[in-house]
Amino acid sequence: MPEGPEIRRAADKLEAAVAGKPLTHVWFAFPELKAFEAQLTGARVERFETRGKALLTHFSCGLTLYSHNQLYGVWRVVKAGETPQTTRSLRVRLETEDAAVLLYSASEIEMLDADGVAAHAFLQRVGPDVLDMSLTVEQVKERLLSPRFHRRQFSGLLLDQAFLAGLGNYLRVEILWQAQLAPRHKAIELNNTQLDALARACLEIPRLSYQTRGTVDENKHHGALFRFEVFHRAGKKCRRCGGIIEKTTLSSRPFYWCPGCQA
C-alpha cells in the first residue's frame, strides 16, 4: 500500500492539474454519489488534503470528497475528454476545461459536509500527520511516552495510524534503522537520547521521502524516491556497520533490520 509521502505526491499532481478551475464535468460510479454530480459541476476544487493515507478533495461549494485508496485505488491525471484504456474500474471523474483527474478501483469514497469531516470515524481515529510541518519532535516524543502508546512494541506501533498518520511498512523499517533500534523495543524502555533519535526519525524519514525528487532507481517501492538503507536489502551489507541485513515478518509485514547496529 502506498504510504503518506506517495499519497501526498499524488495529491500535489492532482492539485496542479485541476485546483482553482471550474469543473465542467463530474461523474461518480456509486449511486449514492450521483446526486452530487450536478451540484459540483461549475464548482472548483480548492485543494487536496492528505490525512495519512486518506485524501480529502475540498470543493468551493463546501463539500469534501473523502477517499482512501487501500491496496488498489489509484488517481490519474489525463487531458480533458480522455479516457485511458485500462482494466481498472473508474470510480470518480473530475474534469475541467483542460484536464481531468480520475480515481480508479477505490472502494472507500464518501461525500461529506464540514460536520461530516469533523465526525468521520477514520479521520477522528488517525493521529497527527507526519508530513504536517507544524508537527515537532517534542510532540512526537510526547505521543511515544503517552499511556496509550508507551508500552507498544515499535514493530506494531509504527504501523498504527492512530499513533502517527502516514507511516507504513517501508517507513517503519527505515525509521528504526535510522534510530538504531530493534523492533521489539517500547518507548518506556528508552533513554532520552534514544527517544529523541526515534522521534526525529519519525519526522525526517517520511519528509525526506516526500521531498526527494529525481530518478527512481532499483530501490523504488510504491514511488519512494530516496535510497533505502535496509528495506528490500536482505543479505546485503549494512552501510553503517557492515553487518548483514536480515529479513523476518513482524505484524504480518516483511521487516528488514541490521542486527549489528540495531540494538
UniProtKB/Swiss-Prot annotation:
Zinc finger (FPG-type): 229-263
Entry annotation: catalytic residues: P2 (schiff-base intermediate with dna), E3 (proton donor), K53 (proton donor), R253 (proton donor)
Superkingdom of the organism of origin: Bacteria
SUPFAM superfamilies to which the protein is assigned, alphabetical: Glucocorticoid receptor-like (DNA-binding domain), N-terminal domain of MutM-like DNA repair proteins, S13-like H2TH domain
EC numbers on record: 3.2.2.-, 4.2.99.18
GO biological process, one term: base-excision repair
Coiled-coil stretches noted in the UniProt entry, renumbered to this chain: none
Keyword Ligase in annotation: no
Residues given in the record as DNA binding sites: Q70, R125, N169
Gene3D superfamilies: 1.10.8.50, MutM-like, N-terminal
Role: Involved in base excision repair of DNA damaged by oxidation or by mutagenic agents. Acts as a DNA glycosylase that recognizes and removes damaged bases. Has a preference for oxidized pyrimidines, such as thymine glycol, 5,6-dihydrouracil and 5,6-dihydrothymine. Has AP (apurinic/apyrimidinic) lyase activity and introduces nicks in the DNA strand. Cleaves the DNA backbone by beta-delta elimination to generate a single-strand break at the site of the removed base with both 3'- and 5'-phosphates.
Similarity field: Belongs to the FPG family.
Protein name: Endonuclease 8
Organism for this UniProt entry: Cronobacter sakazakii (strain ATCC BAA-894) (Enterobacter sakazakii)
